[in-house]
Amino acid sequence: MPQQRETAHKTREWKKLTEYADATRGTQLRELFTEQPGRSSDMTYNVGPLHVDLSKNLIDERGLRLLLDLARARGLEDYRSAMFDGEHINTTEDRAVLHTALRIPVDREFSIPVGADETQDVAADVHAVLGRMRDFAKALRSGSWQGVTGHTIKHVVNIGIGGSDLGPAMAAQALRPYMTAGITPHFISNIDPADVAGTLDGLDAESTLFVIASKTFTTSETLANAHAARRWLLRNLADAGVDVEGDDAIRDITAKHFVAVSTAAEKVQEFGIDTKNMFEFWDWVGGRYSVDSAIGLSLMAAIGPQDFMRFLEGFHEVDDHFRTEPLEMNIPVLMGMLGVWYTDFLGAQSHAVLPYSEDMARFPAYLQQLTMESNGKSVQLDGTPVEVPSGEIYWGEPGTNGQHAFFQLLHQGTHLVPADFIGFVNPHDDAVAADGTTSMHDMLMSNFFAQTRVLAFGKNAEELKEEGVAPELIPHKVMPGNRPTTTILANKLTPKTLGALIALYEHIVFVQGVIWGINSFDQWGVELGKKQANALLPAVTGAERSDAGDSSTDDLIAYYRQHRD
């Protein structure tokens, strides 16, 4: 396991970057493009299906060299090797971090030690589960798996939360055009009963199957929703004339309409799901890194095993790039270090992700969990405080909707917000605009290109004056530019492209975690809130008097109880 001898901001490389930032603070992107005629080609890279242009970022060649010097000083290459080799880099939970193993090709071998004289054949285990997932998906899609009344399954409802929901829900929406077998995925996550009610409203119980996704099968929100779903199923099947009385009837119904994604076989059985219908994953896979594991079962059912394997191919291409490319040509490294540059040296407080694709609408929310749950830490690996800003705050909406909502702040606000623009050359859906000839996708992409140009280069007072703008309006219409963006283009939004995009950001998160000296693979901040909620539940239900330990919480619960119907 690599060791970091000092905190990041005390290194010589950090100090050099601070000096560089001070010396170049007034540099304009206009100047950089003028001084470096080949800047665009010099700073554009390709990995798998992704074409990545970094040229509109606020940095020059020297700055990039200094950032990579910092990466080396922090041991990034050693940490990268440790992760891929299966070392326990998740030190607070003493676990390996092997989400990259989930997409190992079938012809690759990979094992890790699990004891003094034992090894686990990780590659074989992964492909065994993928094989079972493939068989299950084929059974659903062919109609050989049927509900208790003999109806084929048309609706697959994933019940999970966090990483057991955000990943497959995002991917299912993004890969909508690949759902050709008549199976529609749905997703329930929130403990708010409106979620389960709204999702199940209008579904045919006889053709609905539920996937209960919980590693431990103890997640309170997921189990509450699973029981609510079974009550809905039994009620609707009873209305259809099905016998739902007695343990045997309920067991038969559950066997036909419920499967589990979990590691807790005993608890899965207690719920009534046969363990032969349980799809496992491992403690070396964190929830937010698990969409390509059995957590993606509902996705595989919807898009089919072949396209799911293409999804994994996209991940693996970026994994290989990240693992083998030198830092100077390594896209996740460069993008991760640019995030550190903006956060720690230029004072950026958030990072926008702007996919110009309605199908990618949930991608920013997915990245919020990936980045903020991973790097939202204030303690280093050795238990000492992080003394510099850490953890990028990700947010965003699809274009062009965002242009009419928050782009005003990006263009003329006082906050520096680096932004990633994600676009696709060829659409799955296109239509003709109002003029009867122009492609609507071409209109979308003209906005895509225009926004990155205006953010970078703006429009100054002299240019406005030449256009005849009234003097009193010129200050209001000046677009300062110098807003940094990264542009990611792909030929089409395919399963492989989506897998590559997800892996790109996974490795960006890893890079930044190494620089800040934090564990990107635990989430203790989530755990305390769960415990507090369980402790307060008796007071919220009225079974006990509230004694939370602070007057605000006690008074709020009292108000809630007073007005609860």
Curated annotation (Swiss-Prot):
Location of this chain's protein in the cell: Cytoplasm
Gene Ontology CC annotations of this record: cytosol
Active site (record annotation): E373, H404, K530
Catalysed conversion reaction: alpha-D-glucose 6-phosphate = beta-D-fructose 6-phosphate
Gene Ontology biological-process entries: gluconeogenesis; glucose 6-phosphate metabolic process; glycolytic process
Enzyme class, first EC level, given as a word: isomerase
Function description: Catalyzes the reversible isomerization of glucose-6-phosphate to fructose-6-phosphate.
Family the UniProt entry places it in: Belongs to the GPI family.
Name under which the protein is recorded: Glucose-6-phosphate isomerase
